[in-house]
Every structure is written in C-alpha cells, then in structure tokens.
Amino acid sequence: MEENEVESSSDAAPRPGQPEEPSESGLGVCTSEAVSADSSDAATVPGLTEADDSGVGQSSDGGNHSVEEVSESISTDPLPHGCLPDSSSVSRGPVAEMPGGPPALVHSSVLPDPSMLVSDCTASSSDLGSAIDKIIESTIGPDLIQSCITVTSGEEGGAETTQYLILQGPDDGAPMASSMSTSTLANSLAAIEALADGPTSTSACLEPPEEPQGDPSSVAQQPPAPVTEELDLQSLEAMMEVVVVQQFKCKMCQYRSSTKATLLRHMRERHFRPALAAAAAATGKRGRVRKWGTSTKTTEEDRPEEEEEDDDIVDAGAIDDLEEDSDYNPAEDEPRGRQLRLQRPTPSTPRPRRRPGRPRKLPRLETSDLHDGVGQPLVSSQSTQSPPELQDLEAPSSSGLRALGKVGRGLVESGVSQSDAENAAPSCQDEADAPPRRRGRPSRRFLGKKYRKYYYKSPKPLLRPYLCRICGSRFLSHEDLRFHVNSHEAGDPQLFRCLQCSYRSRRWSSLKEHMFNHVGSKPYKCDECSYTSVYRKDVIRHAAVHSQDRKKRPDPTPKLSSFPCPVCGRVYPMQKRLTQHMKTHSTEKPHMCDKCGKSFKKRYTFKMHLLTHIQAVANRRFKCEFCEFVCEDKKALLNHQLSHVSDKPFKCSFCPYRTFREDFLLSHVAVKHTGAKPFACEYCHFSTRHKKNLRLHVRCRHANSFEEWGRRHPEEPPSRRRPFFSLQQIEELKQQHSTAPGPPLSSPGPEAPQEPAPFQSPETPPLLCPDALGGTTIIYQQGAEESTAVATQTALDLLLNMSAQRELGATALQVAVVKSEGIEAELTSTGGQPSPEDTTPRVVTLHMAESGSSVAAESQLGPSDLQQIALPSGPFGGASYSVITAPPVEGRTSASGPPYREEPPGEAAQAVVVSDTLKEAGTHYIMAADGTQLHHIELTADGSISFPSPDTLAPGTKWPLLQCGGPPRDGSEVLSPTKTHHMGGSQGSSTPPPAASHTLGLVVPQSPPSAAASSTKKFSCKVCSEAFPSRAEMESHKRAHAGPAAFKCPDCPFSARQWPEVRAHMAQHSSLRPHQCNQCSFASKNKKDLRRHMLTHTNEKPFSCHVCGQRFNRNGHLKFHIQRLHSIDGRKTGTSTARAPAQTIILNSEEETLATLHTAFQSSHGVLGTERLQQALSQEHIIVAQEQTVTNQEEATYIQEITADGQTVQHLVTSDNQVQYIISQDGVQHLLPQEYVVVPDGHHIQVQEGQITHIQYEQGTPFLQESQIQYVPVSPSQQLVTQAQLEAAAHSAVTAVADAAMAQAQGLFGTEEAVPEQIHQLQHQGIEYDVITLSDD
C-alpha cells in the first residue's frame, strides 16, 4: 500500500490565532467537506495498519488520524493497483473549462504528460478541451470505467460537487479507487495561470484499512454547498484516467509501500532495531500528537535521500506554486522526532473544538445545524482520536497510521480504498447512515433522548408499548403500567407489594394472582367448564382437554384408602391389615407346634412360642437339634432349626433363597445369578427367565399348538395367603356376627349346599347342617354311591384333628346317621357310611353355637321332617355328653360319646346319661327309658333332685323337655305321638317337638338353675365352697386358706378371717418378686415359677411321653403334646371347671329310686306319673360321681385316648384335659389308656398344608417314635391314602370300636355298688374320672 503522500503547504491548516486567508493559488479557501471526507473515510477502516516512517500523507483532522481508507474488497494481490490522487493534488491541478459550463479542476496525474496542460494563463478553453479529449481517447476504456472520477465544478460564489471513479483491478476486479476530496474553488480562472508551470507536488494514493469506530458515510455527513450548474456525465468521463501503482509489502507485518527503499527502511527500523524502539519509548516521544502540530526539526542530510525517493514515485504529483510553497521540506518524510503537524486551510464554518478530558474510545456523536435545519451527526475532533494504547510506539506519523501497525491482529490487507459513498448517486450523498451497532444492550450513557434516533425501530408497532423503567416489563395499557409501577416496593425491581393489604411477593405474577382475592374472580374462564385462571394461555391449554380430536384417557381408578371387613364392618387403612384381621374370623390355626401340640393363627406368635422350647446346653449356649450348630442367640438358633424343617424344599445354591416351586428357583437363579433363560419355546427360538412369560408366548404366538402344549405343561394354581373365605362363608360369618349377642336360632340353616355334591336326588335333597362357628359345614347325602367319598372324607376330617374341630373344644360337632333295617341301626360319630337304598336314614345333629348353646336336630326323609332342639347357653354349654344304651327298635343318636349297636329285640333297653359336669352343683341329667319319654332331672348339691321352674328360664329358651301324652309346661295343647314325625313347624314354640318317640339316645345338655350367677362363677373352693369366676383367683384363694375360716398371705405373716382383706393385702405383693434364682437374676412371685425356672439350669425334663419318648420340662407341654399328636380326634379342650365337694348318689333298688324321683317331681312341675316313672326305672342304674383328690392338679396327667385290645374295650371321655369317666365291662380291670387307636388298614401319615391330617397304624405294628416320623408336604392332587383305604379307615376308626363294645354288652346291665377300694384303684395314677360299670343283672 502506498503510504507516502505529499501535500502542498497551502493545505496545511493555519496556526492558532491566525485568520484564515485564501492562498494565492485560489485554493486556500476550502470547506470542511475536505476534512470531513478524509476523516470519514479513515473512520470506516475496520482495522489499522502500520504507518510509514516518513510521515508523508498526514491529512488528519486535528493531527491524530491520517486521511486514508481501504478498499472494501481488501485485495491481497501483489500487483500494483490504480490509485487516484487526493484532494491536495486535485486542488493544485489544472482547471479544465467545460464547454458551456463552469471550469473544472483536473488532477495533474490524470494527464498522460504534464506538459500537455496549458501553462499559460491565457490559454483558451478550446485548448483545454482538446487536451481532455486526448486523455479520454488514449487512456480511458469502457472495460476500466465503473463509475465516474471525482471532479469538482462550480460557479462564482458557489460550492463544489464531488463525484467518484471506481477503478477495476487487473486480476480480481475489485473496485480500488479512493474518493477525491473536494476543495473550494476560486471564483475566477486565475488558477489556470498558477498551474501553467506544471505539476511540482507529488501525491501518492494511500490504501489504509478502515477504522472500526469510524463512520463510512462521514463524507456525506456535511452536504456540499449548492452549485449553480453541474457537469454532465460526458464531461466527467473526460476527466478519468487509470493509474496503476506498484506496491511493496512487508512479510512480517501489514506494512506496504510504493517504494522499495521505504520498505527496506521500515524493515530495518521496525524489525531489526528493537533497541531503537526501546530508546524512543524511554524518551517519551511516542505519545499522542498535539492537536495543532508544530514543525519538526529537519536536517540537511536527509533531503537528498528524500529527493531520490521522490524520483521513484510513479505519481509524484505537482507543486502548484513554487513561490508560495516555502514550507515544503522533503526531509520531513524521514521520521526525526515528532512529526510536523500539517496545516489545512480552515473552512468557512467554524471547526468544532476538542472537548476537555480524556480521549474517548467510542466516538461522540454530535449534531450541527445546517442550512436546512436538519441535525446531522458529526464526528468531533476528540472522538476521532485513537486511544493512546493503540498508537505506535516508535513511528511519529499520525495516530491512525501508527495504529494500523499492530502485529498479531486479524487485519485486512490494504489496497486502493473506496468508500460506500462513492458508489452512491450524487443526490443521495447528503443522507446520513446509522453508525454500526454493537450487539447487546447499549451502554447506559447512550440511553438519553439524543441517542434514541439512532436506535433500530421495527416498522411494526409494539404489542406492549408501555415500558416499566424499574424492571423493564412491558404492558398493554397505561393503566396496567401505573398499577405495576405503584406495586414496586420502594423502587425495588424484584419486590412487589399489594396496595390493599400487607402481601409481599418477589414475583409479579404472584401479585397478580393475589389481587384476585380482592377482586373476587379470575379474568379468564373456560367456556365448557368452571375452570378459571389469571392467564389466558392457561385457559387455552386447558381447553385442549375438551377437544374432540384429543383421545380421552380413562379416569384412573381411585386408590382405596379404606378396606372394610366384610364380616364385622371394621375399616382398615391397608389391605395387609385387613388380611391379618380376617384371620380372627377364621377358625383355622395353620401353625402347630410339634412339641406341645399348640396351634397358632399367626406365624409370628408361633415362632415366639417355639423359643420356649429351646433349652440351653451349657454356659447359655444353644445347640441345634438336627446338627452340631451352636450359638448364643435363641432367635438365631430358631431360624437355623426352621431351615431344617422348612416347607420350601428348593434352595438356591448361591444364596439363602428357598421356595416351594422348582420353576421359581430356576427363575431366581437366572435373574439373580447366571442371567440365563432356562425356559425355551418348543416351537421357535424364544426363551425367557420366567415360566409365565413362556406360557404367554405360546398362547399368543403359537395359538394352534397352545392346547396341546397346555396339557403337557399344566398351569399350577396360584398360591395365596390364607384364610380363604367364599361368598357363602362370608355371609354365614356376617349372620353369626350379627346374631351372636342374641339367642341362637332354632331354625335349620340354609338348604343351599356350600360344596358341590357329586349327586343330588330331588326326592331326598341334601341336608345342610351349618356349624355355628363357621369352621365346618357338612352335607350329608343318602342313596348315592358317588357320595361315599364325600361322607368318608368328612368323617375323617372331623375325626382326625381338623383345625376347625379344635376350635369347637369339647363340644365338637357330633352327627349320627341312623340306619333302620329291622332292629339294626348303625351309628357313626361325625359322619359315617351311607345307608343302603332300602333303609330309611335319619340324621341327628348336635352342635354348639358360638355363645355356648347347642342344637340337636333330627331329620327323616327330607328337610320337611327336620326337627331341631335348641339347647341354652350357660356354664354347661361346653359339656360333653355320652349315651350309654340304645333304644330297642327305632334307633339312637349320639353326641361326643361312642355309639353302640342296638340291643337284640325283646331286650329291655336302658339309658344312662352322664354329663361331664357331673361333679358340679346343679348338674342336670336327662334320662330316657322306654323310647316314649325324655326326662329332665336336676341333681343339686344337697342330694335332692328337682326340676327347674319356668321362672328361671331365659326368654325364648327352648328346652328339650320332650313329652308324650302329658300336657306341656306352658299350657299349650298336648302333642300326640302321631304328630312326632311331622313337627318341623313347631320348633319356635317354648316346648320342643316330641322327637323322643324315635330318639331314645338323644343327649342334650342340662339347663342352668340360675342364669346369672352360674354364668359368671364357674369355679368353687373345695374348702369353703366359695365360687369364683376364674380358676386363677380360685387357686389364689386356696393357697391363702389357713383353716376353714382363716386366711394367711403366702408371702408374709399377714392373716385375716376374711378373704377380701387378704386379697387386698396380696395385691401389695404383686409387684414384688421375693423368689430369686441363685444362679442368675431371675425372680418370681411364687415358688412354682421358680421351680420351673430351675429346670432351665439343670436341663432336666422330668415329663416324658409314653408313646414317643420325648421329654418335657413342664407337664403342660407334655399334655398338649399328647393331645395334639397322639390323640385320634384332637379336640381342643376348654377351661377346667371347678368341682363341688364330693357327692355320690347310688340307686340300688327300685323302691329307693321311685321315692327319690317321686319327691323330686312333687316339689316341681313333674311331667311323669308314678306308673311312667316306675316303668322308666324298671332297670337299675348305677351313677357314680366321685371327686378324686390330687395334690397338684397342674402336674396331673391328662390323657384322652381310645384303646382297643381285642375283646376288651375301654372308652375314656375327657373334658378340660381330664378323664371324666370310663365305660367298661363289669369284671374288667380299669386300665389306663396307653395306646393309640388301632386302624387295621395300614399305617400312613398324611400332611396337608403343614398339618398332620391323620395317622393310621396297622394292628400289631409298633408305633413310630416322633423322631422317626418324616413330615413330607404333599400337594392336594397327591394322596398317600387311596380312596378305598379312606373308606375302610373311616369305617374302622368310627365304627369298629362301637361294634366291639356292643358285642361285649349283649346282656342286661346289673347293679353293682362302687366300693371305696375300686375308687381308690382308679386314683393310683393321679387321674380324675368317673366309673360307670355295666353288668348283667
């Protein structure tokens, strides 16, 4: 880039204080347009290049910037480019006079030869025109001209007009022409005379890059003075010439020069003399050049060198006037100290002065009033200064050129520059372009009103024209703006306050929502529903819910928050809690202890119970019963032992996981450990980790083969947690729950069967006998062989320790199926074999209600003949009943006692009924003698026999006082024997139907003499006969007895005559534990607990099972062990009852019996006459009620067994874990029961759902010990016992004992008095029981 520019001395600005005078050449009067044009072009340079050291070409406004500009194309072509002379050369060029127009000033370099110009002042215009024509014909061609060259023309007193020429480069075709600045022309043609001598000044066209802060249109920012006449296009084209300038560029920086010597000097001083630069920096002469520059000191030595350089310049220019150009010194091209400040002639308008203060980085835009009154921005002298840090450190040239030399900046290469204003038409030169805007928000100082006109304004109107100056929010209306501004808390842009209350918020939207609390409604509302919102967009988004095009999702199922119990209505918040609660309605106890026989509903309670059976080995260490594992924690040992007997046989080999299904184990191993897919499809390559997924795959993908595949791979039923309740069972439980407080219903249960029966005959529909406790419902059918399995399985379930029957206690459901064929009747307990088709079956049931009442029913030939007897509740409701004899012809029923065969025809049948509450005061007995009458006898404590009066009966109680021929006790009509078979509708009367005409062995419980006291006080003291409601209180009372009428505290010497005083004193010792263990910190309230505790230290187990040999440290554990594991019926026994003092009634003769009963009947409302009574007591009976004295009742042996040893049959009936009586043949020694029930059809152990269903032994085979029994869980589809074996077992287990007993009792029973020796013989084993001896007369 050519950077050397020589200006004439006439262009220099005058020194301060001197008036502006035009030079003699006529060009001294120049307008500010020249200055503006040069400075504006320099201001548009995007980057600055390094200035030449010669300092030639300084043409800045104020001496800080060079008047240079770079081409827009930024050509990097090394070939020389065409340049145009600047305004100085134009102002000193010849003036060409156009024909018919004002004279035109032409640059001397445009001419091919300077001698062509007319140097004489008298040159005519025709000679000048011919010279111009030669120039155009020789140099200007159509391929080079893009526009017109800058020429100035004007008239006298008029301003000049500037036009431009764009030259095309030789290679890239980029426009590379610099604008020619205008200058003031003289009003006369005297300038031609000044130009006659030819050009003497040189002017090189520079190509500086643009400055980023500049304004590319600053040339046009001041419009030229109005001209009187303008040149046409043809005249202007005559003034054009293409000039090609060769340039030299430095490879180490962006410096360019038109001469080679200048470039070499630049390289020596800039790149090879760093010491010179440091010295120059130390002298401080590199600072900002003063606004009004002074002449620099020149030397004579540099002038010849500069003159040689001028010879090398292609376009040397011309010096207009040698006489007046005395200030020109070529030595100023070499930088020697501070550069000389060239002065320019001042324009007619005053130059803007520099403002005081530091130079600004950004230009300060100002307005100046022009002739047309329009304010146009001007770049002030201060705004055009370059920052000091951008100035060159060594070059004394203008600041603009020095800033161009910064190394390392991404600068464009300089060339022949041309501003955008040169391409514009002359008419639009006066339009001001907006300054380039920086991205982002402008600085705060540009927010004033005077700068708003330069901001970009969209042609579209603002949607929210009102702006908040505090936070910048915009609003639609002025009212919204005012409300918003007033809501600002103390002018804080991030805090808002409510104008009506003390509400504060940091969000404007929150305040808007709050304001609707004062207004009352939200402005936007949905058209289809009641939805409202503060914002309209929310309503629009909500309206999509009502759109028909949108697919509506189904409403999610509301999550249940309450789970009511279907039985009692109690509500639980969780399903798990409801499931646990439902167990309370179930009678099943699935968890049974194998050591003591206790059963539990909850597994947690069961495990806590198992901890009591774990005994320490030594040093409080516990050892596993199955292996050598030893630990110090009971719970850890229990969990270990449960792993040995777990009902989950499939165990993972990688972790402790166990399961009861093999496919679950395979899935577990695949998912958790191996990652394999063990379940593969047989029809394709599909495989999965879960068996259920394989089933789904086959059903979906191979539907045609799914049926065959399903037969080979049956689906196992899902396992669910118990208890299970069918809908019918739930309805029954609801009914029982609602009727539990009231009296029991006497009507039969619903006839709809619960279980599907294989066969149902319409002539003889099944009889449904529901158990009042909901544990068991039995359906009995007749005359169908398909029902054999049902009846047999029912009999076994009731006989062999079913959990539902354990809940019933001693009052287990007893059912007899009576077969009448001639004189035979086969009875079974809890079910039996179906009768032959030619017999007339009769079903008699006896079961206990939940409140303790019993119902005895008999049915014959269908439900229409069903007769039921409701038995009242009371302290005797938990009793067991037994039938000793059988009716002669019709048949009999039985309760919990063993049934016997009917006696041969012609023999007189005798019946003795003994209650399990025989030893209590007020015990009731029922006696049946001749099959026509049923007698109710009450045995009192004093030995008298009386009948209860109707006053003592509870309302609605139906007493089993069956009569035949006698008037009812309530005054109703007498029932004849002919109506006994059709009394199904008379069950609701207070007098029960006469079912005794066909039932002689019907056993019903006795009624309470007093419904109040006996129901609350069941236990009485043997010493003072005082009654107590609980056994524990009675035992405490007995221990406190110090005599018949004295009481003493067992823990201290305190004594008193009244039991309440001693009881109140003993309450003080309730928190004391005086009995302490000498080996540990255990302490107890009584010695008995301490004695039991001592067994844990000695590991002594004094109580052993006589069957399996297992030993226990408590007799109670042994008792439950035998009852649960070695008992055939496994009934749960009730609470022990307190017994009255010993009372024995022996009826040895008929006369004594008649007298006793006659006295009893006279004292009450008797129902039998003397003849009937004598006939009923024609046979002698022995009733023995003997209380056995046991020193320690808790340690007594309580056994419930049935023993069969061939011809000898002994039947032991128990209640409350005590043997109540033994029925045996006369002359046979009363043996203690030591054997199991013998079942002759094989020995089997069947386990169902973790419980032993039944155990069968072959007769004569040794009994298995407990340790030899292996509990193997089986599925319901697998049966260890065949159906035939079940039927045979049911027959043998239920009827074999009865058949054998009846075979031995063929004769009439005689009378034999029980002697004290015999009673003592029954006591030697510490067992309490009654003996009824049956012998021939």
Swiss-Prot record:
Positions of C2H2-type zinc fingers: 248-271, 466-488, 496-518, 524-546, 563-585, 591-613, 622-644, 650-673, 679-702, 1019-1041, 1047-1069, 1075-1097, 1103-1126
Function statement: Component or associated component of some histone methyltransferase complexes may regulate transcription through recruitment of those complexes on gene promoters. Enhances ligand-dependent transcriptional activation by nuclear hormone receptors. Plays an important role in neural progenitor cell proliferation and self-renewal through the regulation of specific genes involved brain development, including REST. Also controls the expression of genes involved in somatic development and regulates, for instance, lymphoblast proliferation.
Biased composition (Basic residues): 351-362
Tissue-level expression: Expressed at low levels in cerebral cortex, hippocampus and cerebellum (at protein level).
Composition bias type Basic and acidic residues, residue spans: 363-372
Pfam family name, one: zf-C2H2
Signal peptide: none
Keyword field: Activator, Developmental protein, DNA-binding, Isopeptide bond, Metal-binding, Nucleus, Phosphoprotein, Repeat, Transcription, Transcription regulation, Ubl conjugation, Zinc, Zinc-finger
Superkingdom: Eukaryota
Biased composition (Low complexity): 31-45, 54-63
PANTHER family: ZINC FINGER PROTEIN, ZINC FINGER PROTEIN 335
GO cellular component, one term: histone methyltransferase complex
The organism of origin for this protein: Mus musculus (Mouse)
Disulfide bridges in this chain: none
Inactivation phenotype: Loss leads to embryonic lethality as early as 7.5 dpc. Brain-specific conditional knockout produces a brain with an essentially absent cortex lacking all cortical neurons.
Descriptive protein name: Zinc finger protein 335
GO molecular function: histone methyltransferase binding; RNA polymerase II cis-regulatory region sequence-specific DNA binding; transcription cis-regulatory region binding; zinc ion binding
PROSITE patterns linked: ZINC_FINGER_C2H2_1, ZINC_FINGER_C2H2_2
Family per similarity comment: Belongs to the krueppel C2H2-type zinc-finger protein family.
Region annotation Disordered: where it falls in the sequence: 1-108, 198-226, 278-444, 733-767, 963-999
Subcellular location: Nucleus
Biased composition (Pro residues): 741-756
